[in-house]
């Protein structure tokens, strides 16, 4: 099954999104989800049966367009075209609605009308003038009619259908009243309804313009990220400095960056040193020092030194491109909380049309007359707002994920953003998560006839090609002492135990107590040393030669400066903290005590970590796992929420739901706080959207007027209310932009 993201064009409300989903999902081997806020289609389909063209034809059959690869520049261009078009239409509508209102209602307020327009003197001219003034307004709102009636014919009515039916009913009644003036009843000028149609269209155009502008602000995070990438870069070609477009950069090119310039792509510094502002990528406020050999990330700003770097990642492979992709995917995804709103939106418009018809018929048969019945009928149609329901969740998700990205917290889906605030237990991996993951060798104790430098040479030689941080500490110590590292043979890594290799004809084993026990190697002589080292928070490893204990090497990892503060924040939030590690119990307890962690699960093999998470979940705990994504991917995937600590350059950790780019544990609390704020915002939006419709529709239907002698809602006021209901939801979502991620 292929999974793709496309852009849908021509949608105006949640019912439109539902129509596209419905058209696609009725086909076998297609699973589609449409986000009205981002106008994105997430679709899975069998590539053997479908391709983009077939998917596009299905979408077009529902009355909408589909674009495969829409660049951000094209999106901005289309957005500006939409804003410009709405402005022009609104201006056209306003130019004609003002005289329309003056003629139709001015005389009621004592405003003077020329005699040829005076309804008491010339009722027909009075009616025809309003009809003529209404025509340009209808033209300004032509999309409501064309889309609305087309979707009605397709049996997928949308908000445009409600507007089209309501405005058309008002216009047709106006034409009928005009006919009556000519034929039988000059007093029919009292209820022409042209002004209702004109004002409804004008107000909804105004609301649509506000909605489009506000919706544009909700996606500002993506625009900021895209804006980080420079258009050009300076490279060295045949010894000559040359400026080229960034899309023409190749891996291996040497790029020149001067102070104040943006770094074009990811790379490794080959000349010079500087400090780099990575705040827009990671949220890190302080510049980061860089020297030869260090990695630089495209989109960051070179502060105070000229550097040359070799391009290592370009195009879609850069960190910035991956961040943009992850944020776009998250903003296009749906949170489970939106399901109820989606179900309601799917049936909303047909139900509203039914309520409007019942309302109109009920008032007419009650003896209130056609004019009153029509007024209530139109009011019900135009006050109903499926858009408020459809936008309630995705807009908050858009702003929330964008806010996270601005602060170095990449939330990969709407579901992750929704569920993170529920976390009650957090399990932390130790190495690279609580500690820096860069251990140093602290002790080397030799037994028997072996010398310390001899053991260090053996250990460093067999560990030389290992990528494990503990091995790196041993090798670095040997290199620092200029000890010769020699070749080895038959290397074998045993995860959770240690390593085995042949060195100069001897079998070497380096590992933990479990490894020694499995090989029945007597370690009694080292027990005291082992305990002392463990109690000091170090990780002791046994070295055996030909199945005899030769020594102990101890390595210690440095605790991150922010780890203790991060744990304190989480405990204040009422969250239980656990450290999960392969270290021995005493070492693990020492580290946990240093940072204030509640519980420790030690001596766990890598493959057992996910099982430990599962055991916690079986106790009805909502568990998050925090790790570096290297040897704890199964545990990250098993957890209710997997949180990966990034390193500023690795953001595509597949098994994680959230990636913390800054490698700062304090961002775990930030992610939880952001999730809570976003869910609160979504609930506010949903409450407002449901409350508005639940209260507004009965009010428009005249329930309060009929039974409680309350006010009667004019269709024009109903249109005003509907126009601002969506804007209010969007405005509330935008409040998240001011949320402080601490």
Pin down the residues of each PLM region.
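Actuator/coupling domain of P-type ATPases
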Residues: 60-76, 124, 130, 134-238, ...
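ATP-driven catalytic headpiece of P-type ATPases
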Residues: 88, 300, 424-467, 497-578, ...
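Membrane-embedded alpha-helical bundles of multi-pass transporters
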Residues: 109-124, 153, 172, 403, ...
